[in-house]
Amino acid sequence: MSHRLPPPLQPGDRVYAIAPSGCLRSQLIRGRSELDAYRQGVEIWRQRGYCVEIDPDCEAQWGYLAGTDAQRRQQLDRAWQDPGIKAILCARGGYGASRLLEDWVRPQTDSPPKWLVGFSDITALLWSIYNEGIAGVHAPVLTSLSAEPDWSVRRLFDWVEGRTIPPLQGRGWGGGTVCGTLLPGNLTVATALLGTKVQPDLEGAILAFEDVGEAPYRIDRLLTQWR
């Protein structure tokens, strides 16, 4: 299956913030609250010239989730159905996106595909649209954007605005050269999606996993599941 990139963004475009996973917490983490970090992330997009609109339920809370499943599905629907919205910005990861996919079908519209921006738990949504031939961007959520180094923020905006970006940094353990479709994802979330309808066709895919705060034995267990 070939995958379409959404049209490049331009300053002045409308972008929409949603919280499809965990709720925004007010307690301090490393000296600041997630709410503060989220608002700083919104401000970075606004400083780039984008019209950031925030879903009315974006700061909702239902236990550890950002509202009930129905509320969070409605956030997704509002974002996808508005033809003027060019990108969907996820507020944070955590947990909860995969719950939405049990009873949610992306609204079909005549407009071009939108950018879906996020990582961590947002992997479930990114892989869901990947199955429809739409490429998203595995990138910082709003709560983490302001903590990113300048080069990382530049790379995000260069990519969604249609500019060429330099090759990925780092070196693989196994060596060699491969060619395929790059499919990033959170290791824990991606492993949970194995064997479900959301699991993409992995033939020819180059998997790029991320995770944080997991003990080595848990990483070992998760990777073993992929053998």
Locations of regions flagged by a protein language model:
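Internal helical hairpin/lid segments
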Residues: 201-227
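N-terminal glycine-rich "phosphate-gripper" loop used for MgATP/nucleotide binding
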Residues: 88-98, 119
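Conserved anion/nucleotide-ligand pocket segment
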Residues: 134-195
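Short, acidic/small-residue loops that bind anionic groups at enzyme active sites
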Residues: 104-129, 135-142
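Structural motif
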Residues: 87-89, 117, 206-208
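Short glycine-rich anion-binding loops that position phosphate/pyrophosphate groups of nucleotides
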Residues: 23, 92-95, 214
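ATP/NTP phosphate-donor binding region
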Residues: 1-84
